Amino acid sequence: MKCQSIITTACLVGTAFAQAKLKIMPLGDSITEITCWRAKLWDLLKANGVTDNIEFVGSQTNNPQNCQASDANWDKHHEGHSGFLAINIANTLLEGWLASAQPDVVMFMLGTNDVAQGRSLTDIMAAYTRMVDLMRASNPNMKIIVDSVIPLPMNNAPIEALNAAIPPWAAEQNTTESPVYFNDVYPYPSTALRDGVHPNDAGDVIIAGALDPLLTWVIRSSTAAGNSTSS
């Protein structure tokens, strides 16, 4: 009986390991929460044959735009929160979200609300750095994808300054153990906005299409290295 118990336990452990998936957190504000690029991205990832190896994670599963993917079972988990600032996420919220979801990969677009509320570029970049520190404290091997921020026609100069600052910042933050990747969603015309802030369908296509090659590569390289990297 003891032998049978040991064999059963070993089988259960082996099955759990085999089924482990790379955990990817889509992090952001309303541009992550109430738009459809995540559904479109999932379809692109499925076409690339990698969705069996991943799961999106986060405390949210809402779908206010009733976004539809070709895959009816697309993973709706995310950490997008309308109206939230990068500064507030970094200072008070992200640590708990990371502890709950335990992602291996975080991809984020943040800063629109900070700019809209007059926060300085220095403060926004400090929040970015704080977020990276928290991600690495959660998982020393965290893979981090930072998007450029889509246009804000009502006040675009600070967005342009933020987008110019992200690539050199990402290069400074990058490490072998925990790489930081800059993902440029431009060219992104203002006609790809539905209300001057959020992407319309064309904008969702742009964001998903920009993320797809990089995220697919991250997924394949991470799973080839031994499946998920979280403890």
Annotated model-derived regions:
Residues P26-L27, R194-S231:
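Histidine-centered active-site loop/cap adjacent to the catalytic His
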Residues T32, C36, W42, K46-V50, ...:
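Sec-exported extracytoplasmic/periplasmic mature domains
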Residues V132, M142, V149-D184, D201-V205:
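Substrate-gating cap/lid alpha-helix
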Residues G49-Q60, M142, V146-S148, F182-N183, ...:
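Surface-exposed patches in mature extracellular/periplasmic domains of secreted proteins
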Residues P103, P140-N141:
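Proline-centered flexible-loop/turn and helix-kink motifs
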Residues V13-A20, A225-S231:
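Fungal extracellular Ser/Thr-rich, low-complexity intrinsically disordered regions
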Residues M1-Q19:
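Fungal secretory targeting signals
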Residues K23-P26, I31-A126, N155-E160, A164:
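Conserved SGNH/GDSL esterase-like catalytic core that processes O-acyl groups on lipids
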